[in-house]
Swiss-Prot record:
Gene3D superfamilies in the cross-refs: P-loop containing nucleotide triphosphate hydrolases
Positions that bind ATP: G35, A36, N37, G38, A39, G40, K41, S42
SMART domains for this protein: AAA
Function: Part of the ABC transporter complex HmuTUV involved in hemin import. Responsible for energy coupling to the transport system.
Family designation: Belongs to the ABC transporter superfamily. Heme (hemin) importer (TC 3.A.1.14.5) family.
Keywords, ordered alphabetically: ATP-binding, Cell inner membrane, Cell membrane, Membrane, Nucleotide-binding, Translocase, Transport
Topological category with respect to the lipid bilayer: Peripheral membrane protein
Protein name from the UniProt record: Hemin import ATP-binding protein HmuV
Length: 262
């Protein structure tokens, strides 16, 4: 069962944000969404998550139009990590991660506690479990929010039912080690747990290293879509980012690329 955007067009205040964009997120794949600032990446992610209604076009989860699903139905099938999660309450870290279980009221407290423990461990933030969320650094908060969406994805996972995870710039506040850990976890969720994962990143080389498929947006349109070798070309770098770049085979990772701006 795929999550599929078909010919999406979306505008805000009369200004076009997306124009005729189609994209499929399939189980078992990690898709990277790239593009310059203002290209429409976050808008496309929000539309795929069912949070924004397109002016034309549809988003389908299998055969179901996303517009026909209510908020709880959506939350039980997909989890979203926004670019800037807002949380104004003085909650403990475990309470924040436990919010991932909110769409699943049938879970008993013991099951929720285990879900939280597992998510904290998978996100490598177990050592923060007793801290207060507002007292954390920006990077620590980002990792705790990642644990929250992991809990949401793993809750009440029925065999054969695909879950989708959407991450909007999840590594923007992270140091290099934690960037790699988060993206490695995202890829494992796709390849080993069979999830469909969409991630927005600005680091082209991180996208080249971890993603199976890349979608390159330019001015609200899909400029390129495919494996990294097809998308990360000097011509695309010039047209989309306005930079001259060399694209080389990665010296230590077979089948992966390095993009070096001149």
């Amino acid at each position: 069962m795929t999550l599929q955007a078909r010919n999406l067009t979306l505008a805000r205040g009369g200004a076009p944000i997306l124009t005729d964009v189609s994209l499929t997120l399939a189980p078992g794949t990690l898709v990277g969404l790239l593009g310059a600032n203002g290209a429409g990446k976050s808008t496309l992610l929000a539309a795929l998550a069912g949070e924004l209604a397109p002016r034309s076009g549809q988003v389908y989860l299998g055969d179901a139009d996303l517009a026909t699903l209510n908020a709880r139905q959506l939350a039980r099938r997909r989890a979203v990590l926004p670019q800037k999660p807002s949380l104004s309450f003085d909650l403990g870290v475990s309470d924040v991660v436990g919010m991932g279980a909110y769409p699943f009221p049938e879970l008993d407290p013991a099951a929720v506690r285990q879900l939280v423990r597992d998510a904290l461990e998978q996100a490598s933030v177990t050592h923060l479990a007793q801290r207060r969320y507002p007292q954390l650094s920006g990077g620590e908060q980002q990792r705790v929010q990642f644990a929250r969406v992991l809990a949401q994805c793993h809750a009440m996972h029925a065999p054969g039912q695909t879950r989708y995870l959407m991450l909007d710039e999840p590594i923007s506040n992270l140091d290099p080690r934690h960037q790699m850990e988060l993206l490695a976890t995202a890829r494992a969720l796709a390849h080993e747990a069979g999830m469909g994962v969409l991630v927005i990143v600005h680091d082209i080389n991180q996208a080249a290293r971890w993603c199976d498929t890349l979608a390159l947006l330019a001015d609200g349109r899909l400029a390129a879509l495919g494996p990294p070798a097809d998308v990360l070309t000097p011509d695309h770098m010039r047209r989309v980012y306005g930079i001259e770049a060399d694209v080389l085979a990665h010296p230590t990772l077979p089948g992966r690329l390095l993009v070096l701006a001149r």
